[in-house]
Amino acid sequence: MIPRLKELYYKEIQPQLKETLGYKNTYMGPKVEKVVINMGLGLDGADAKIMKSTEEDLGKITGQKPTVTKFKKSVANFKTRKGTNAGLKVTLRGNKMYEFLDRLVNIALPRIKDFRGLSPKGFDKFGNYTFGIKEHIIFPEVNFDRIDKIRGLDIVVVISALNKDHSFALLEKLNFPFIKKGDN
């Protein structure tokens, strides 16, 4: 079954962007390549029980088993050792990526308390969009009674676009709730 957001992109959004951005070919337009979700654990990464429960939570949120990231250096001030667990990360592509973005935009983000929108300043010079979420419990897949600690997520949406304006146009068409100019 084709995800709803993927179908919407190919049938409606891609032709609209071709017209508005002035592309000669439909496939020259911006496209979401992948979504990378990172959850840093810090010193909690050394605890196997916490690591396992957090890995399960991130797996439920993304629908894919996360990979463990490790510290690259030992830093005495942060009490970290080289090679110990630093966090978890998941890279989503294809159908799982579209399903995650659909759930993020339509279910998870509206559940954030006092949510006014995403900052449009999160674009880099290549057009990729990065933002953070302070509480992973906004996703309905996470059982609130079973979590030990509320953790944050870093989400990077990698987009193949010529510049950040084209990426912004794509994410707006995908219903990303950006803060409008003039709203504070």
UniProtKB/Swiss-Prot annotation:
Entry annotated with the keyword Cytoplasm: no
Listed GO CC annotations: ribonucleoprotein complex; ribosome
Cystine crosslinks: none
UniProt superkingdom: Bacteria
One GO BP annotation of this record: translation
InterPro entries noted in UniProt: Ribosomal_uL5 (IPR002132), Ribosomal_uL5_bac-type (IPR020930), Ribosomal_uL5_C (IPR031309), Ribosomal_uL5_dom_sf (IPR022803), Ribosomal_uL5_N (IPR031310)
Keyword Membrane: no
Keywords: Ribonucleoprotein, Ribosomal protein, RNA-binding, rRNA-binding, tRNA-binding
Molecular function terms from GO: rRNA binding; structural constituent of ribosome; tRNA binding
Pfam families: Ribosomal_L5 (PF00281), Ribosomal_L5_C (PF00673)
PANTHER family: 60S RIBOSOMAL PROTEIN L11-RELATED
Purpose of the protein: This is one of the proteins that bind and probably mediate the attachment of the 5S RNA into the large ribosomal subunit, where it forms part of the central protuberance. In the 70S ribosome it contacts protein S13 of the 30S subunit (bridge B1b), connecting the 2 subunits; this bridge is implicated in subunit movement. Contacts the P site tRNA; the 5S rRNA and some of its associated proteins might help stabilize positioning of ribosome-bound tRNAs.
Subunit and interaction comment: Part of the 50S ribosomal subunit; part of the 5S rRNA/L5/L18/L25 subcomplex. Contacts the 5S rRNA and the P site tRNA. Forms a bridge to the 30S subunit in the 70S ribosome.
Record-stated family: Belongs to the universal ribosomal protein uL5 family.
Protein name: Large ribosomal subunit protein uL5
Organism for this UniProt entry: Pelagibacter ubique (strain HTCC1062)
Native organism taxonomy: Bacteria, Pseudomonadati, Pseudomonadota, Alphaproteobacteria, Candidatus Pelagibacterales
Gene of this entry: rplE
